């Protein structure tokens, strides 16, 4: 099993966000999971132009940056940990840009059978909305959400233990291929919604339509 940590703090390895995420990775590694870390600040991530190139030709994009490589790593992972500081009750701009650029993942539910977890830090402690948003993104891509952990910039041993436990839980979910009934209901509703859209736009988005047919979803 392998997990990809995508961290969007501009402070990278020195950030509270990454330090907290590191405890999640420690829990994962103790269970034998191979972990890789990407700091978004090391990559060029442009804003989505809504050109629809990724819908017409899978994983293609008119923008020339590093996003396609990141998306391929996401596809190759069994689980993904999204870690972000709280920027006005939202993920950072770079993380949001990455989410927007993965629109094809949403259309074609490309994180189906994968697992997502969230890590958030802030100065205010008002992090629930950000974790909820990470969970929402995971569900729109058809992933199971194993949970999240959040903390103030200065956190203690209890919070570290919570993050470590989350890593263990993520590893267990992946190993057991755990399905959460309430989440599956949300995912199924999303599939029904996009099934209608994909059929409606099948002439414009031929490769996405073909993907759905090959999956047996249409």
Model-derived regions, located:
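Short, glycine-/small-residue-rich phosphate/pyrophosphate-handling segment
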Residues: 93, 106, 110-151, 159
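N-terminal beta1-alpha1-beta2 submodule of the flavodoxin-like/Rossmannoid cofactor-binding fold
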Residues: 1-104, 144, 161-218
